[in-house]
Swiss-Prot record:
Gene: pheS
Cofactor note: Binds 2 magnesium ions per tetramer.
Binding site for L-phenylalanine: 338, 377-379, 417, 442
Protein name: Phenylalanine--tRNA ligase alpha subunit
Molecular functions per Gene Ontology: ATP binding; magnesium ion binding; phenylalanine-tRNA ligase activity; tRNA binding
């Protein structure tokens, strides 16, 4: 870049500061303000802009000063608590007697410091003086305080001593920044060529247009080849934004959002869903079992027990064996949010029902790139007369289409509480078909004991896995980490 092009790229304030520095070579802000004729803030802003262009440099020195707190002022007059006591301690004295002579707070503070400094020791509740209690560095530092705040050198104290006083909240630290602006060789060379001080217009205003004054004004040139610094506005966390998008889709489709407790009885988490009591998913290695129990609902327990043991009053064999009421009453951290929807159906057995729940579930998983002990699930149910399996497929396909997945397919699946069952999959470029959850029609063994007569379509979809696909992540753990760089650069939407 030529000298002229560099000069053309300088603002008038930068030129004024550079000319001032040419004469001063180096200056503090006050002197620079005086010499350049600018306000101190404007002068320093110009100095920093010159530093970016390597025409000046701004150095900064931080000076630490210390002053006494209110408590420090008091101890400067009366002496530190340990000094007050050791001066009065001619012979061994019980701590109880000391508390009658001094405040309990003073004795409490002093005891530790007396032992630490080796001035006294405590034996069986007796304070015994030991050694010579000469004036310590902390006492000398306290005595040196007078008037304004002081530096370490002015106090004649070392860092360790002042650090102890800071911990005891007897002094406070004040930091004062001193800046010095200096001209560089490149700045000197440019200034020596001569700088033209001419007022420039940075903005074309309506007043300039109306008056025609813009014709005689010089406009500051703009460089369009410089990439501006990125500005990161506030935004919702990408994962939270996707969850809100899913919520909005189901609300727009006429669903009611429901919530439920994190702690559920095994009855609602497993038994009401016709999951056998010896199912592997109920083992300790898969479920967070709690030490508490609860009362299971009497109006359903008998029917659920019969359904498990012999199939109840429908054409089913059940699971056989004896249903354990005590096991059903044990509390767990819910392993799926289906426990919330089945309980909601039991409370609302009459159609129509359209409900969904987006919340956390908990399983004893080893943390790795695709598993965490806590994860979000999107659970939903539709209960109404004449509902069919085809309605379920259409509903799920519509949801995934609205989430931006063009290709959706369904594979046969198996779950203890739905029949028929499917696993929805979406097609992702570079990955192929990806499974995202499970769905099906609730079995009679689930609905009959709860007094539900209409068909129930149900699904449980993996929220975090779907989020990983949408956000292009390969590690599930990144969804829960506060990586500020990733959060700043995350897309609000795709255009």
């Amino acid at each position: 870049m030529t000298v002229m092009s560099i000069q053309d790229n300088l603002t008038i304030n930068e030129k004024k500061v550079l000319l001032a520095l040419e004469e001063l070579r180096s200056a503090v802000p006050d002197k620079l303000e005086e010499k350049s004729g600018l306000q101190i803030d404007a002068a320093m802003q110009a100095a920093f802009m010159l530093q970016e262009k390597e025409l000046a440099s701004v150095s900064e020195k931080v000076l630490e000063r210390y002053s006494l707190t209110k408590e420090g002022e008091e101890y400067k007059k009366t002496g530190l608590p340990e000094r007050q006591i050791i001066d009065a301690l001619k012979n061994p004295v019980s701590l109880e007697e000391l508390r009658s002579c001094f405040s309990p707070q003073t004795v409490g503070i002093a005891t530790g410091w007396l032992v630490k400094k080796g001035w006294a020791k405590v034996e069986n509740g007796i304070m015994v003086p030991s050694g010579e209690a000469s004036e310590g560095k902390d006492e000398k530092a306290l005595s040196a305080f007078a008037g304004k705040a002081k530096t370490l050198e002015e106090l004649g104290a070392d860092e360790g001593t002042v650090k102890d006083l800071l911990k005891r909240k007897l002094v406070v630290k004040h930091e004062e920044k001193f800046r010095t602006v200096s001209i560089t060789d490149a700045g000197s060379e440019l200034a020596s060529q001569g700088l033209v001080l001419e007022e420039e217009i940075a903005q074309l205003t309506p007043e300039l247009l109306k008056s025609g004054a813009w014709k005689e004004k010089k406009f500051r040139p703009y460089r369009l080849d410089i990439t501006p610094k990125p500005l990161y506005g506030t935004k919702i966390h990408p994962y939270r934004r996707l969850i809100e998008q899913m919520r909005q889709i189901f609300l727009e489709m006429g669903f009611t959002e429901i919530k439920g407790g994190i702690i559920q009885s095994s009855f609602w988490n497993f038994d009401a869903l016709f999951q056998p009591q010896d199912h592997p998913a109920r083992d300790m290695q898969d479920t967070f079992h709690l030490g508490s129990t609860c009362q299971i609902p009497a109006e359903y327990s008998g029917k659920v027990a019969a359904m498990h043991e012999n199939g109840g009053d429908i054409d089913s064999c059940g699971w056989g064996g004896i249903w354990d009421r005590e096991l059903a009453g044990r509390n767990v951290l819910r392993t799926h949010t289906t426990s919330v929807t089945i309980k909601y159906l039991a409370d609302n057995p009459e159609p129509p029902v359209k409900a969904f729940c987006i919340d956390r579930a908990y399983r004893r998983e080893t943390i790795d790139p695709t598993h965490t002990p806590e994860f979000e699930q999107l659970e939903g149910v539709v209960m109404d007369k004449d509902m069919s399996f085809a309605d379920l497929l259409g509903l799920l396909a519509e949801f995934y289409h609205r989430m931006g997945f063009e290709e959706v397919r369904f594979r046969p699946g198996y779950f203890p509480y739905t029949e028929p069952s499917v696993e929805p999959e979406v097609y992702v470029d570079g990955l192929g078909w990806v499974e995202l959850g499970g769905a099906g029609v609730f079995r009679k063994e689930v609905t009959e004991p709860l007094g539900i007569k209409a068909p129930v379509l149900a699904w449980g979809l993996g929220v975090s896995r779907l989020a990983m696909l949408k956000l292009g992540l390969k590690d599930l753990r990144l969804l829960y980490q506060s990586d500020i760089d990733w959060l700043r650069k995350s897309e609000v939407c795709k255009i």
